[in-house]
């Protein structure tokens, strides 16, 4: 997979699932930005997928 395709996939995933995510908004309101961000990266399945793409880009 080339960089252009990875960036396209990242953008689509973010726009479709993360942009208006209720859980992220709620956690940000209750626990703060850092907690919400940590949850998204470490526990959310979409965040895990985004992280995998990021790893591919850094090792590319």
From Swiss-Prot:
| A Pfam family assignment | zf-C2HCIx2C
Protein origin, superkingdom? Bacteria
Tell me the InterPro entries matching this sequence: DUF2602
Listed name of the protein: Uncharacterized protein YpeQ
Q: Which gene encodes it?
A: ypeQ
């Amino acid at each position: 997979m080339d960089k252009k395709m990875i960036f396209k996939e990242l953008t689509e995933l973010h726009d479709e699932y993360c942009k208006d995510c209720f859980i992220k908004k709620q956690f940000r309101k209750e626990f703060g930005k850092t907690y919400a961000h940590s949850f998204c990266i470490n526990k959310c399945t979409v965040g895990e997928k985004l992280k995998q793409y990021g790893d591919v880009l850094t090792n590319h």
